[in-house]
Amino acid sequence: MYQPDFPPVPFRLGLYPVVDSVAWIERLLEAGVRTLQLRIKDRRDSEVEDDVIAAIALGRRYHARLFINDYWQLAIKHQAYGVHLGQEDLETTDLSAIRQAGLRLGVSTHDDMEIDVALAARPSYIALGHVFPTQTKQMPSAPQGLEQLARHIQRLADYPTVAIGGISLEKAPGVLATGVGSIAVVSAITQAADWRAATDQLLALAGAGDE
C-alpha cells in the first residue's frame, strides 16, 4: 500500500527527462514536459547553486514536478518540488530534513535488495533501472530487461514507479506495457537528431503525468 513518508506524487509521472542543464529544462518545459530532473554531477554546491535556483524557478513557472538530483541541501534551501537520490546517497543524506521541508523524494534501485532499502525509506516514488544497456552512466549492475521490470512493478503494486536506463523511442512502448508509471529518458531526447520531435513522440506515448 502506498503510504510514503514524504509528500506523495501521482502514480503516473509520465515522461521524465533527466538533463544536466537549465537550458534543457527550459526547452523541455516549453515543449510540454511536466516531470523532469536536473542531474549535474561532480560539482560543489557553490558551483551549481545558480543552476538549481534557475531550474526551480522555471519549474514553478510551468507548474512542473522538478526534481534535483543529489544536491538535497540546495533543493531544501530553494524549495524544489523534490529530490532524487541514488542508493549510495541514502546513508549520507538527512532524510528527515527533506521530509520536514515538504519535498518529495525519489530513490534509485537496481535489484530486489535495493528495492527493500528504498521501501524502508518510504519515498514518494521508486526508480527501477537500468532496464537496457546505457552509455549515459557507468553501471555496476546488469540490465534488468522487461521481464524483471514487470516483476518489480507487480511487487510494488500501487507505488509510483519510474523506469530508467537505455529507454529509446523504439523501446518505450514495451517499457510502458509493464504498467510502470513513468519512463525516464536521457539520450533519447538530448542526442536525438530532432529533440523536439522525439519529445513530442515520447509525450504521446507516456503522457505528461497525472495532476
From Swiss-Prot:
Cofactor binding remark: Binds 1 Mg(2+) ion per subunit.
Positions annotated to bind 4-amino-2-methyl-5-(diphosphooxymethyl)pyrimidine: Q37, L38, R39, I40, K41, N69, S108, K137
Gene: thiE
This protein's name: Thiamine-phosphate synthase
Binding annotation for 2-[(2R,5Z)-2-carboxy-4-methylthiazol-5(2H)-ylidene]ethyl phosphate: T134, Q135, T136, G166, V186, S187
HAMAP family: TMP_synthase
Any one of the GO BP annotations: thiamine diphosphate biosynthetic process
Catalysed reactions, semicolon-separated: 2-[(2R,5Z)-2-carboxy-4-methylthiazol-5(2H)-ylidene]ethyl phosphate + 4-amino-2-methyl-5-(diphosphooxymethyl)pyrimidine + 2 H(+) = thiamine phosphate + CO2 + diphosphate; 2-(2-carboxy-4-methylthiazol-5-yl)ethyl phosphate + 4-amino-2-methyl-5-(diphosphooxymethyl)pyrimidine + 2 H(+) = thiamine phosphate + CO2 + diphosphate; 4-methyl-5-(2-phosphooxyethyl)-thiazole + 4-amino-2-methyl-5-(diphosphooxymethyl)pyrimidine + H(+) = thiamine phosphate + diphosphate
Annotated Mg(2+) binding sites: D70, D89
Any single Pfam family the record assigns to this protein: TMP-TENI
Magnesium recorded as keyword: yes
Disulfide bonds: none
Entry keywords, A to Z: Magnesium, Metal-binding, Thiamine biosynthesis, Transferase
Keyword Cell cycle among UniProt keywords: no
EC number, UniProt record: 2.5.1.3
Family to which this protein belongs: Belongs to the thiamine-phosphate synthase family.
Record-linked CDD domains: TMP_TenI (cd00564)
Record-level Gene Ontology MF annotations: magnesium ion binding; thiamine-phosphate diphosphorylase activity
Role of this protein: Condenses 4-methyl-5-(beta-hydroxyethyl)thiazole monophosphate (THZ-P) and 2-methyl-4-amino-5-hydroxymethyl pyrimidine pyrophosphate (HMP-PP) to form thiamine monophosphate (TMP).
A single GO cellular-component term on record: cytoplasm
Biological or metabolic pathway of the protein: Cofactor biosynthesis; thiamine diphosphate biosynthesis; thiamine phosphate from 4-amino-2-methyl-5-diphosphomethylpyrimidine and 4-methyl-5-(2-phosphoethyl)-thiazole: step 1/1
Needed co-factor(s): Mg(2+)
InterPro entries: Aldolase_TIM, ThiamineP_synth_sf, ThiamineP_synth_TenI, TMP_synthase
